[in-house]
Every structure is written in C-alpha cells, then in structure tokens.
Design a protein with these regions (language model features):
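N-terminal glycine-rich cofactor-binding segment that shapes the pocket for flavin-like pterin cofactors
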Residues: 1-213
Length: 213
C-alpha cells in the first residue's frame, strides 16, 4: 500500500536516515519497489491518491507543506507502465477519483493500461473527500455524499458500456491479406443518457485482456 508522494501515511518518517521515500519522483524508486515486491511473492501493489490538499488545520496548508503530508503528490497511473515492464506477475491497483475524470477518456486510459500490463491493472473507485480538491476543480465545495455516489453509479454504467459493449469478441481480425483490421459489424456505437453523463460514440480501444479492470 503506497502513494505517489513522500511518506504516504507515515508522516514524518521521510526524515529518517534510512527512508528513501523522498525519491518518489524518480522512476527507479517505483521500478525497484515493484521488483522487490515481486521477489517477495506479493500479489499486487495498491496505490492511493487524493485530489486536493489538507488545509483545515489552522486554516492553512503550511504544516502540510513543511511535513510533506501527501503533498506534493504525483499521478499514480503514470507509474504503472514502467512497473509492469519491470515485472511479470505483480498486479497494480490504482486509485482514481471519478468525480473529476471524464469517463470517456478514463475508459481509454484504463484499457490502454490493461493492454500494456497484460491484464494486471485494477481500479480503486473513489469520489473524493476534500473541499480543497473540489474548489481546485472549479466547484464551490465538495458535493454532498449521496449525490457523489449517484454520480458514481452513472459514471460506472457508462464506462462499463464502453468496455463491455462497444467491441464484440472477435471484432479484431488483423487480417492483412483482406485489409481488415476490425469487423465494422462487431463494433458498436454506445449511447448513454444518464442523470450526470451523456455519451454518443465508440470506445477508442479494442478489447483488453480483462475488458473491465
């Protein structure tokens, strides 16, 4: 269980002489961790994430910055390809806040990672809990709990349609002689009209190993 930041939940441990989490923003830190976990026969690495900063204490972000309390924090998804290339069996569970991610683009990103990892990617679904994150995304504050989860249901319904319903099994032929990469009869337009999201289009990726991560 880790996070693309200094220390994760072990606040202050980064000052210990033997701690190397200050190197979180180097590729080697993550590929070395992935290889170590695989040698130790771990099944997977779960990476947390937040959108926003802790700014409630004394109405300030100062302590958060001084102690590096999950700030700075980098994007977890961008670590996966490198760690997958350095391992063969380790799985990757990545946290993504669907409140601020367009579902159409997110569906493509996860399908891409499922291809590149050969089916070793998973998604930890969250809706956010920080007012600071909501305000940074242009909102007045954090949306009410029930509304966030209603939006999440609509989001999931949409991405499941893209992953499971746009490309049939057997749609991809890769027939060089016939000059047919994909059979148009087996690729379908997805139409979604939900309370929060609307979509009219095709999933941009051919089916990945898991389809739905």
């Amino acid at each position: 269980f880790n996070m693309n930041c200094v220390g994760h939940i072990n606040h202050g441990l980064w000052t210990h002489p033997r701690d190397n989490s200050v190197d979180y923003n180097t590729l080697e830190y993550w590929t070395d961790l992935a290889k170590t976990l695989e040698r130790g026969l771990f099944d997977g690495l779960f990476i947390a994430d937040i959108i926003g900063v802790y700014d409630v204490y004394q109405r300030s972000v100062d302590l958060t910055l001084r102690e590096s309390i999950q700030l700075p924090v980098n994007d977890p998804l961008l670590l996966v390809s490198a760690m997958a290339a350095a391992t063969k069996h380790l799985g990757f569970g990545i946290t993504s806040n669907l409140s601020y991610e367009p579902p159409y683009l997110f569906a493509r990103r996860m399908s891409t990672l499922d291809h590149l990892t050969r089916g070793r990617i998973g998604w930890n679904i969250v809706t956010g809990y920080l007012d600071s994150g909501a305000k940074a995304m242009g909102l007045d504050g954090l949306t009410a709990h029930d509304q966030r989860y209603e939006r999440a249901e609509d989001y999931l319904e949409l991405v499941y349609k893209l992953w499971e319903g746009s490309w049939e099994d057997g749609a991809v032929r890769r027939d060089k002689a016939a000059r047919v990469f994909a059979d148009p009869a087996k690729v379908h337009r997805i139409r979604h009209q939900g309370p929060y999201y609307q979509l009219d289009g095709y999933h941009l990726c051919e089916p990945s190993i898991q389809r739905t991560p």
